């Protein structure tokens, strides 16, 4: 099965573009690959000869298109708006696609929902969103909701940068709050209850965004699938934490996971947490390039079929020890190498009496 590794092995990253936003629920994987190739071979779309289309990939709705010429890839990216059109019996479907450069450190498109209300009245939220758009222009922001929530979409690295920017801002506000509270207590002791309530509310809202560990340790953000595989299938994660006496505080939030690392042994080396952070980043990057995810949809299926799929996954789990199986109410994710996930999926489909698409 095709994977992002094909791009690296073909030595063609400069001729490759990442295409996100494919309508995965409307067409089969095979048809989508054909539609994508046809779209990017059309000169009206600044396209040209396509060497290969890598789809499906580990990330839902994302394909890699390798052109025969570097110039064509550059032209495709220069034309920022791409519309994938498909005529059906009743209507013509048009879908907006997002294209970007491929790089060794590429993390495909992810979505995240932010709750900016934790900043309270410290900043005007509209101004904050404008600043974020200017700072990270590659991200797409939805309109800000009255409750302070906003959704963002973009590459994993861009979302990671956004999260770190917000955490840094929150830490700064927290420090200002502390300084303000200290000064206020010196001159305003006539209404201590009001003063205490005001400072506590402000501090509490910001603290919900900034984990205690992050203020005194090391923080990193990972792709959730990569993190789960690293934690449950790579013994080096837990053994390294134990070896360097590091406490790991993990928060899974959709497609991204935040990890805060802190030394828990008195007298241990001060750089231990930083060293462990670097090791985890190294491992996660290698895994991101190696891993692939397949998904079995349970939602909408009859209970009998759901049970058959679950039983098949359980039956094959002892044969594929390097495949991680994550069971959810609506679906089952299997994560592993490209060959393992393909063979695992093929085995499940055979056990439940279906053909591999």
Swiss-Prot record:
SUPFAM superfamilies for this protein: RNA-binding domain, RBD
Domain RRM: 15-104
CDD domains per UniProt: RRM_RBM43 (cd12546)
Keyword check for RNA-binding: yes
Alphabetical keyword list: RNA-binding
One annotated GO molecular function: RNA binding
Protein name: RNA-binding protein 43
Matches recorded under PROSITE patterns: RRM
Gene name per UniProt: RBM43
